[in-house]
Amino acid sequence: MLNLKIRTEYSFRNAFGPIETVISACSGDAVGVTDSGTWGHVKFAAKCAEAGKKPIFGVEISVVEDASERTRQPSNAMCFLAKNNSGLKEIYLLVTKSTSAENFYYFPRLSYSDLFDVSENIFIFSGTNPNWGMIPLSRKDDLYIELNPMSSRKALEFATAKGFKTVATSDNYYPRVTDKKAYEVLVGRNRTDRTSPMHILDEWSWREAVPWGTEEAVNNTYEIAAACDVDLPTAKMVKFKTGKTLKELCLDGAKRRGITLDADYSVRLKRELETISSKKFEDYFFVIADMIDWAKERMLVGPGRGSSAGSLVCYLTGITDVDPIKHGLMFERFVDATRDDLPDIDIDFQDDRREMVFEYLTKKYGPEKVAHLGTVSRYKAKSVISEVGKELSIPPWELQDLKAGIIERSPGDERANKCIMDTFSTLEVGKVAVGKYPAIKVASEMEGHARHCGTHAAGILVTDSPVSEFCSVSAQTGAAQIDKIDAEKLNLLKIDALGLRTLTILQDTLDQVGWTRQDLLNCPTQDESAFRILNDWKFAGVFQFEGQALQSVARQIKVSDFEDLSAITSLARPGPLMSGGTSQYIKRRTGQEEVAPVHPVFDRITKVTFGIVIYQEQVMEICREIGQLTWTEINQLRRAMGKSLGQQKFDQFFENFKKGAEKNGTLEKKATEIWQHVHAMGAYAFNRSHAVSYSFLSFWCCIAKSRFPLEFAAASLRHAKDEGQGKRLLREVVKEGLEFIPFDRDKSDVNWTVQDGKLIGGLTGIKGIGNRVAKDILERRKLRQPLTPRQDTLLSLGKTPYNDIFECERKFGHIKSDPAAHKIVSKISDIDEITEENYGSFVFFGKVKDREVKDLNERPGTRKVSGASLSLNLTLEDDTSQIICTIDRFKYPRLGLPIVADGKIGDWLLIKGNSRKGFRRIYVEKYRNMD
């Protein structure tokens, strides 16, 4: 018996089982996958190839009497299996139809009438215990009645009476008997009350579970598998119609940018064009260049992102605005000479206009050839612990230490999905948890498992033929049922078009002052007024510099060169900060430490970074020039760095480096010394192309802020993502010397504006006034018409979140400056000082914004606790940030109850509490009501 109806993790919270586990649980030389969608097809094909099994591609879709009726109807969960590639394309279209607005109702559906339109290129399985009235009697050649453990004898009787063939199937929801607990946690215990087998059955088990099953049903599994022959199609490159060659486009770009193609430029351009041509990537560059050229006429486009800034072709065609020769960037970091897959060109657009780019591509290439990329979300270690804890009724506070202590690894690490397993087996906190709750071990099976699917935030697919020839497309969302990795395997052209709020803010600023994008590009990168913004610590609104880590590094370096921006943004990351590389760079950059010579080539490559390896490109150059590594080895090394696989993986290249260095005339001792320098920072090295590209965005913000501080602040406030961010930003710009008025009855516009040298708050900042009402008020003001009574009342009150942005400082600044004088022995912190990394004991003031009482015994399906079960969550805010503070069930009677009984929203509390590593939350020890 072959298993032709198999569910995997790609049935998303309806079945458990990684594809490789599912395939290994199936006997025979062929396997059929029938998830509720086609997300897993590409990975399924790859894993079948590894296992030496034939893949049968299918899908399970519910069929109702009339899917156009938006009512709950009896349904048949029928399976459709592709006989050939035409059948596979038809399956993709069936999935698309089932997700249409007309058919979708709680879940994807097809109508009974659709079955008559299914071609002979598809096998149909009846489903388990179907509505027999919805089995089309005319489809006897390729519609099979399922016999499985959940079927009744009526299935066999119906097939015999009506002349249908039968097929033996499992009705699996997990691969092995031992996976039942993981499945229960995944879908919820109430879903698994049936007694029949839910795992994959072999023939013997099937005969035992279906004693009335027939030999014909078993034999038909082999006949069906033999009749199926599908190869997943791969896409051809999109053909871009143009009368120019890529070289001609580059030469035109050089003239437009005023570049004389001297030896450096001409040799580099020739090399890049030859590489691109040899891989037949020209059309890809034309597609991207055309899209960006169109976008630049309508919005602000980022200067570059990722490795594409290392390409001179990208610069000359206008794809990027970063000169790779001027900034010392590598083409090989962008196009891997040893691989034929398309390079990634990521582009930033204004976040409020990004969708226009998708619309342009749809119009140019046709709606059937453009789709949003899909994405699959997977269970991370900490979320798995939470899910399992709920299912096993483990009190959440008993899992806090375990979650805080879980081993953390980067996504590219080969044991990235084994963090829980390794925590349980190697760390004391894990062993204690397993000892107390043995069933929690199931969490290790769920880590990395598919959780849900969605639409990729940036990815767009463009194909030369309809996208539906390669994968299903959700009719409602326009998202393809395929993720980034699988799309690359099918050679689908993928464009990463990201929305960036900073670009929206910059364009808003330019619009206010009459500048254009070219004015920004014309600003010299040695503009001292821009650097002065950072040196004066005026970080508010400056891209990348709003985080504490970057600000800390910037405060220690007097920025005097554009190169400083790239270095700071590359060094203010956990790896360099923890390894000591950042502090060493600061010492050398500020003259506190000499730069000792190491090797002429090494010294030349690291001159710009004071003898410290900061960038991946530096590692690649050192390994190429000194270690004589091949490009294949260098690109393997680059991928190891890019995926942050750590020092052990990085050091695997040392032996070959040492041998190559010796051949190059470098003694083993010196080669080892050079490698030690590379080793110290190489595993944490950053992509220089990306660092330089994003430094331009930071630089543009500094330019805008130095020349137009009020307009830049107004734009930043207009596009703040929420009230909290707006208040924090306003506090900072006021500290930097700007003046503001929260609201002016006669001057306020819809949103923040600049008038009379001040920031004026908008009408929508007033509680109770939205965009529509604000526009009506402005129209009445313009026409000198009276306001409505309600409008007049709201304006008279003038209550905005910005009326008292320094309330905490005003009320308690004297206490914070001298806590000892007020009998407070601890330093009083600001809430923004409490982070996931900066944890421990804190004392701080906070205004109650929200409060929520929770009863542990009211959670459905959980074990009841005896005694105290109530806890209190408080949302507190000061002048810097917000944080959630928890009073647990043991402290609730003493601390929580008085707040609930006598306190109110708006009270100021002085809190003493603790936070734990990895969690930005305070557990309250004591408090004092200051009102």
Protein language model annotation of sequence segments:
Residues 2, 30-33, 194-196, 242-931:
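Noncatalytic, beta-rich nucleic-acid-contacting surfaces in large DNA/RNA-processing enzymes
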Residues 2-25, 29-33, 37-51, 93-177, ...:
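Domain-core and long-helix interface of multi-subunit machines
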Residues 5, 35, 55, 84, ...:
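Divalent metal-coordination and catalytic microenvironments
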Residues 16, 39-53, 69-72, 180-184, ...:
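Glycine-rich loop at the start of a catalytic domain that most often binds anionic cofactors/ligands
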Residues 35-41, 63, 149-154, 173-176, ...:
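Acidic, metal-coordinating catalytic cores used for nucleic-acid/nucleotide bond scission
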Residues 38-103:
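Hydrophobic or amphipathic alpha-helical targeting/insertion segments
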Residues 71-73, 116-118, 452-454:
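Solvent-exposed alpha-helices and their adjacent loops that cap or buttress functional pockets
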Residues 180-247:
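Active-site or pore-adjacent capping/gating segments
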